[in-house]
């Protein structure tokens, strides 16, 4: 679940 937020931040 936490990875989702991290990935989104990196992708953005």
UniProtKB/Swiss-Prot annotation:
GO biological process terms, semicolon-separated: defense response to bacterium; defense response to fungus; innate immune response; killing of cells of another organism
Entry keyword annotation includes Membrane: yes
Entry keyword Secreted: yes
Chief location: secreted
Positions in coiled-coil regions: none
Keywords: Amidation, Antibiotic, Antimicrobial, Fungicide, Immunity, Innate immunity, Membrane, Secreted, Target cell membrane, Target membrane
Tissues in which the protein is found: Expressed by the venom gland.
Compartment list: Secreted; Target cell membrane
Positions bearing Lysine amide: 12
Biotechnology (record note): The synthetic analog S5T (with the Ser-5 replaced by a Thr) is a possible anti-leishmanial therapeutic candidate against both cutaneous and visceral leishmaniasis. In vitro, this analog shows significant anti-leishmanial activity towards two life forms of the dimorphic parasite, the free-swimming infective metacyclic promastigotes and the intracellular amastigotes responsible for the systemic infection.
GO cellular component: a single term: membrane
Note: Many analogs have been synthesized to study the effect on cationicity, hydrophobicity, alpha-helicity, amphipathicity, antibacterial, antifungal and hemolytic activities. A decrease of hemolytic activity is accompanied by undesirable decrease of antimicrobial potency.
Function text: Short linear cationic amphipathic alpha-helical antimicrobial peptide (AMP) with potent activity against both Gram-positive and Gram-negative bacteria, moderate activity against the yeasts C.albicans, S.cerevisiae, C.glabrata, C.krusei, and C.tropicalis, and low activity against the yeasts C.dubliniensis and C.parapsilosis. Minimum inhibitory concentrations (MIC) have been tested on B.subtilis (MIC=1.0 uM), S.aureus (MIC=11.1 uM), E.coli (MIC=2.6 uM), P.aeruginosa (MIC=15.8 uM), and the yeast C.albicans (MIC=6.6 uM).
Family: Belongs to the lasioglossin-like family.
Protein known as: Halictine-2
